[in-house]
UniProtKB/Swiss-Prot annotation:
One of its GO terms (molecular function) is structural constituent of virion. Residues 124-144, 184-214 are annotated as: Disordered. This is Gag polyprotein. It holds the Pfam family Retro_M. It comes from Avian endogenous virus EV-1. The lineage of its organism: Viruses, Riboviria, Pararnavirae, Artverviricota, Revtraviricetes. One of its GO terms (cellular component) is virion component. It comes from the Viruses. One of its GO terms (biological process) is viral budding via host ESCRT complex.
Amino acid sequence: MEAVIKVISSACKTYCGKTSPSKKEIGAMLSLLQKEGLLMSPSDLYSPGSWDPITAALSQRAMVLGKSGELKTWGLVLGALKAAREEQVTSEQAKFWLGLGGGRVSPPGPECIEKPATERRIDKGEEVGETTAQRDAKMAPEKMATPKTVGTSCYQCGTATGCNCATASAPPPPYVGSGLYPSLAGVGEQQGQGGDTPWGAEQPRAEPGHAGLAPGPALTDWARIREELASTGPPVVAM
């Protein structure tokens, strides 16, 4: 009990300051709790599961007997234990206050347990294997596309079933209908309506006042122009 009293007194001085209870008051409280059957041993005081039953029992005793000395001492001790627990003090003495047992370090969680060297090597090998597999997956060529077919035949080889073509060319584009381009079929007919004039020959000009044909643009007679230029001679330049 003396060791427990010393630890609790140190905790109260740290977190309670001048209002810290004395070692005598702490010892009297522990003796009462053991007498009432609330503690099997003084070290049970470090367990948070025993705090609420102790608080309830001392509160009832204070109301019945009018003695609140032990309840006041317990309130200070409880405040110190909770403060140490909330702040998660890492010293060995603080761990003893928190009910982690005799100054021993609490067993770490599964994520904090250091694995043996053999397991670490195995885990490292698995990580390396996963990394290699991911790299190979990125470098591997894409899966060959299934040949495209129309109905049951392949575009490339025309096989109905069991096509072995790795890839097949896309189907040819549909034939562009005649509606997208102007038709030239009527051009020859229009040229031949005036008679048997061959294609490319000069069309007869419409006579003025002719009722049957619409007037068209006059064609330049380059042969006549050349004859006139030859007969007139070169122009005389005035000095």
